[in-house]
Amino acid sequence: MPLSVAGLAPFTVAGCLLAIAASAQVVRQEVPGIRNFAKVESTVACAGAITPGAIEEIKKMGFASIINLRLASEQGADIEGHTAAAKAAGIPYYHIPFSTATPDPAAVDTFLKTITAPGVQPAFIH
């Protein structure tokens, strides 16, 4: 029986990123305003929380876009601040709220469509 997107929901976006990390050489570095920065490969970097002030640095590092998977309810998420900072820096910013506790197949679909769209990579995902 073929799997549907709903059947794949337990295999979260985070799981996909871990699989990429396992197959690539992960480069970690300290970047002010970015927690746990790791460049997974030439087209993707992942991190934990960031500050709006780090967005200009993300653009300077050569990323074409920022994909934020955090829920607006998370402490320090500051979606509005990130959106404004990305607009000021001239870097596309995508907010795709994703809960690992209750994965939403629609969010997974949106992420996959976004990350594979022309001009999105290299992407900074957090």
Over which residues does each language-model region extend?
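Bacterial N-terminal signal peptides that target proteins for export
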Residues: 1-12
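Cys-dependent protein tyrosine phosphatase-like superfamily
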Residues: 16, 20-123
